[in-house]
């Protein structure tokens, strides 16, 4: 095991694992970046809701997962793109698409964390954090 930790990959793994176990919610250690990513997932309809929980430390994000009428998770794919050992960036002209625009890309830009659609609207690029479908 290497000494490098990747909080974003851990966050995404916790969401995937909770969905596989068909949990109604999952508690994840909070950070500004994870909160921003979770807000995007909420706005785009991939989760039901989330709340901040004070635990006398860094806090927790309680993410309420969303399933369809057949108990299939709303998030079908959650893939980490840029990693600590291999950062990936895209400028505003070359932002990737997921499933021909049906999914979203989450980016960290100079204007904050946003979806690919928002980044196109603002004409900014940034680090490609994740792809969601």
From Swiss-Prot:
Named from the GO MF annotations, one term is: rRNA binding
Keywords associated with the record: Ribonucleoprotein, Ribosomal protein, RNA-binding, rRNA-binding
Superkingdom is Bacteria
InterPro entries xrefs: Ribosomal_uS8, Ribosomal_uS8_CS, Ribosomal_uS8_sf
Q: Is the keyword Ribosomal protein assigned to this protein?
A: yes
- Cellular component terms (Gene Ontology): ribonucleoprotein complex; ribosome
Biological process according to GO: translation
A Pfam family recorded for this sequence = Ribosomal_S8
General function of this protein: One of the primary rRNA binding proteins, it binds directly to 16S rRNA central domain where it helps coordinate assembly of the platform of the 30S subunit.
Q: Tell me the NCBIfam families matching this sequence.
A: PRK00136.1 (NF001109)
The Swiss-Prot or TrEMBL record describes its family as follows: Belongs to the universal ribosomal protein uS8 family.
Q: How does it assemble?
A: Part of the 30S ribosomal subunit. Contacts proteins S5 and S12.
Q: What is this protein called?
A: Small ribosomal subunit protein uS8
State the species of origin.
Salinibacter ruber (strain DSM 13855 / M31)
User: What gene is this protein a product of?
Assistant: rpsH
């Amino acid at each position: 095991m290497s000494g490098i930790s990747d909080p974003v990959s851990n966050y995404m793994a916790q969401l995937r694992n909770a969905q596989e176990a068909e949990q109604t919610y999952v508690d994840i250690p909070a950070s500004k970046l994870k909160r921003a990513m979770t807000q995007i997932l909420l706005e785009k309809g991939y989760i039901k809701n989330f709340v901040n929980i004070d635990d006398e430390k860094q806090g927790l994000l309680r993410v309420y997962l969303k399933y369809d009428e057949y108990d299939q998770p709303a998030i079908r794919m959650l893939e980490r793109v840029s990693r600590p050992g291999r950062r990936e960036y895209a400028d505003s002209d070359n932002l990737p698409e997921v499933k021909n625009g049906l999914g979203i890309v989450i980016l960290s830009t100079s204007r904050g964390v946003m979806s690919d659609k928002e980044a196109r609207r603002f004409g900014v690029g940034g680090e490609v954090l994740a792809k969601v479908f």
